[in-house]
């Protein structure tokens, strides 16, 4: 009795709860979102290319608008993301689907301008890059067209990381693509994988007596 009383009197350490798993899209939702962009207009081709950069390269909205034509290496099929005070420089492979979409935009969508920004406005004078807030509006409108709950660009980045981990990509590789300086920021995608396994796990069979 005395031991039990002492045990109750000893303060227990507070256990930090794991962060909630990030919201992600299912593959069919991602396809529906991308197919919602009208590719028959120059502006639609630009916005479709922006959406693919978010989905396939897992870029942040400010990284998308920061891209320049000089960041694309068509021979090596890579895209370079410049270094900032908070982020280190990254070199990412350029998937064929993204390369074709960007090339289609450059040939049939991007207005003539001296700006080196990859994505520019479609109202004169065409000499400035888009803003990150505009990119977020583009994606929220796409969700609305699909009849889905409007979400920010971060859900596309989270979806890429989650599905990359489920396909067997290591956390170090995912961290390199996302530009995380520490693996601690990437651990949450491993937690998502565990939760998915828990959800689909079969119940333990009952013992027949």
Task: Give the positions of each predicted feature.
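Conserved catalytic core of the tyrosine transesterase superfamily
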Residues: 1-209
């Amino acid at each position: 009795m005395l031991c039990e009383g002492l045990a109750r009197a000893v303060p227990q350490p507070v256990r930090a709860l794991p962060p909630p798993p990030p919201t992600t899209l299912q593959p069919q939702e991602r396809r529906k979102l991308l197919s919602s962009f009208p590719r028959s207009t120059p502006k639609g081709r630009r916005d479709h290319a922006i959406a693919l950069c978010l989905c396939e390269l897992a870029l942040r909205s400010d990284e998308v608008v920061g891209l320049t034509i000089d960041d694309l290496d068509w021979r090596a099929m890579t895209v370079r993301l410049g270094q900032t005070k908070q982020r280190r420089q990254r070199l990412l492979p350029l998937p064929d689907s993204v390369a074709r979409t960007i090339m289609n935009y450059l040939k049939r969508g991007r207005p003539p301008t001296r700006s080196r920004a990859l994505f520019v406005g479609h109202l004169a004078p065409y000499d400035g890059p888009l803003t990150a807030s505009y990119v977020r509006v583009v994606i929220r409108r796409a969700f609305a067209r699909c009849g889905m709950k409007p979400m920010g660009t971060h859900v596309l980045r989270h979806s890429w990381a989650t599905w990359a981990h489920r396909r067997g990509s290591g956390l170090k590789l995912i961290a390199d693509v996302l530009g995380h300086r520490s693996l601690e920021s990437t651990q949450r995608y491993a937690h998502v994988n565990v939760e998915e396994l828990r959800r689909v796990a079969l119940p333990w069979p009952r013992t027949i007596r």
